[in-house]
Amino acid sequence: MLERYSSQNHIYQFLERKTRDTFPRSLLLIGESGCGKHHVCDLIKNKLNLDMQDISENLNFDFLMQLYERPQPYIYIIEASKISVKEQNTILKFIEEPLKNSYIVILAENSNQLLLTILNRCQKLIFNPYSIDELRSLTNNELVLKIAKTPGQVTSLLANNLEDIVALSNKIIDKIGTANLPNVLTISDKLAFKGEKDKFDIECFSRTLNYLLVEKIKTDNNIKYQEMYKLVSDWNRERKAPTVVQNFLFERYLVKMHELMRN
């Protein structure tokens, strides 16, 4: 898949040149959600002909010590969005003293998700922005093309009921200040915080709400919409923390938006 996008040629060429002997023991892939980080992991797995294991949920010292005792080499995947600062400190030894014949690949949406000590010890591959023409090869839906920034985001938006997500987002923007608070809090019930299939995908919802707020700000100079945009941005940043209770966090920001637009 990756090779079809000229904007990511540098990543494909990097992988083509590498062998087991020359591949970095600690690699950091940085790019927006849906940019292809997991696809690159599959390419690495095939290139190195090794088994791959996501260890994001098991990052404690005892578990990492068990990995040192494994006789067979592995590719270990760590997702930055799923680990705490304490867990990042734990994996420093893992990075500084690599396992024999094994490799670590860390996935992050941006460098701010990781400690500087980790950033400095990993080789980095950064995804370039995708062009509108590259994304247009996936869809002609103009609204999707205005919202999405990566192929994965295009696919996700197309798979969801975008019309209903837009309606919900516009309802928040236009009416959250006049609705009563109990009704406002029911918005949380519509989002798939636990991956529910019959609810709206959180990533699709957040990107759509962001886009529609930007469009609103362009046509309405009410400073409250700029403040609402900041609240949504803060929510998007905070919800990336691995230990946050997603629905409680979202409800807290719904209350803030309700109070902002009510006054």
Language-model features and meaning:
Residues 71-76, 99-105:
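Loop/turn-to-beta-strand initiation segments
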